Every structure is written in structure tokens, then in C-alpha cells.
Amino acid sequence: MWLADNWKDYEVLDTSAGEKLERWGKYILVRPDPQVIWNTPKDDPLWRKYDARYARSSTGGGKWQNLRLPAQWQVRYKELTFQVKPMNFKHTGVFPEQAANWDFMMETIRRAGRPIRVLNLFAYTGGATIACAAAGASVCHVDAAKGMVLWAKENTKASGLEDRPIRWIVDDCAKFVEREIRRGKTYDAIIMDPPSYGRGPSGEVWKLEENLYPFVELVSRVLSDDPLFFIINSYTTGLAPSVMRYLTETLVAKKYGGSTQSDELGLPVRDTGLALPCGATCRWTKERP
């Protein structure tokens, strides 16, 4: 498991009965987590002293309760700064476990010693975008939701990176990649965080298990002749890390060589000393002589 254990402004305090108790800066949140299938005692007093709790509804969805929070606040991870905003469907705009990938990206880009062009697909609020930009890469950030792209710009500004070479694209990721192929554009590093399920603007249905292989096949066509890394993230429970590795070996490593690793992402739980699993990642890297 790749553990995101370098946070100072965020921590999972405890987990029990389908929920996790978290500290985001100075605020305590309780949010649902489908991985938490254990019913351990909620001995930590902060379970009863939270600033906000997201409660699921029996009819679907849910809402924030006891919301004693500002509309937004900031948390830092190393040199990166993020705007935290409690949203519908429990989210805050940051996936803290991805810090394990941010560290990998920043280290790999800095070690490369050359200009690196990064394509970040399904880029959300831009955690990977600002990590790569902070390391000196130029980044193309693509997400179909305009609000998420605007939020990513806020994070970039908060991190003091607004002058870095970042191209902001609001578009369907597959359509954008198809256009880049026609233009002859290439990238040295590709990151993707595709959803488990979604619908496009014209009613197209996206199911990760059905669409991931052809999508990765498409995206691999914009890799440069000297690629640095290729990363796939997944929060789909049924998609094992080894499946993503097999796919990446077939579509990327077969052409470029290099090495592929896949594993779960996780966050340390303070009160138990255990690790909470938080999705999976596959990383391909081109080993340089």
C-alpha cells in the first residue's frame, strides 16, 4: 500500500460504522466511507464534538449536519495549498490519499532534469496539476465541469503558482484527446482519475470497467517518444490494482518498456495505527539509463 503519511493539516483520527472522523486544519468532520465495514467502539471524544457531519439519506444522497464551518478554508501539503469547501455528496474538494501520488509526481519530474509536459485528465480541483506545476512541469488540466476547473485555478493561486504554464480546458476528456491526436500534440506524462460511472452531455454512458481499456488505448496515443510516467487512479471497488497493471502493461509498457507498479492508496488512522484503504493507483515509469 502507498500511504499518504506526510500530512500536517489533515489526518484520519478514527473510523467506525461506515464513517471516518477527520481533522481538516482546525475543523473536525465526520464523513461516510464505504470501506469502513467494522463497528469498533467510538471512544474518541471528537466523535461527539465534530464541526460538521455528512449524513446519508435512506432515499439516497444526504446532507451536512451541524455545519459549524466557514464556506471555505485552506489546508497545506508541503508547498501546495488547497481550498476546502464542503460540497454535496460528502466531498470537500481534496482527496488526501492522493498525496502519495503527488510526492511521486514531484520527485519524478524533478529528477528528469528536462522540460516535462503533463496531461491531467478528469483533473477535478487540480491536486496533481499543482503538484506537477510546483515541480516545474507544464500542465494541461482537463475536466468537463467548469466549476471544478475554476476551483483548480483557486488552488493554483493559493499555492503561488498562477504564473506557471498551465493550460485550462473545460471539455469531455475523450473528445479533447481525440483533437490532440489530430493536432499531433504529445505529452511526456499522463495522469487520469476517471469516474466509476457518469453521463456525458449527449447522454453517453461511462462505465469504468467497460470504457477504461479503450480510453487508455486512446490516451496512450498522445504519449511522446520519451515518456516519463503514466498514472491511472481508480475508486471503483471492483477494479483491482492488478487489473490496472495488466491493462497498463498491455497498452503502455509493451510499447515503451519501463516498469509498472500498482497498489492500494491508504491513509494512516491515528487512533488505531492502522491504514484506511482509499482506492488504487497504477504507475508506469520509463526507466532511464
What are these regions (language model features)?
Residues 7-22, 29-96, 103:
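Non-catalytic substrate-recognition/targeting regions of SAM-dependent transferases
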Residues 96-114:
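Conserved alpha-helix/loop element of class I SAM-dependent methyltransferases that forms part
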Residues 123, 143-147, 211:
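Short beta->alpha hinge that forms the Motif I/post-I loop of the SAM-binding pocket
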Residues 125-139:
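Conserved SAM-binding loop of SAM-dependent methyltransferases across substrates and taxa
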Residues 145-191:
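S-adenosyl-L-methionine
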Residues 173-253:
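S-adenosylmethionine
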Residues 227-289:
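C-terminal catalytic and target-recognition region of SAM-dependent MTase-like enzymes
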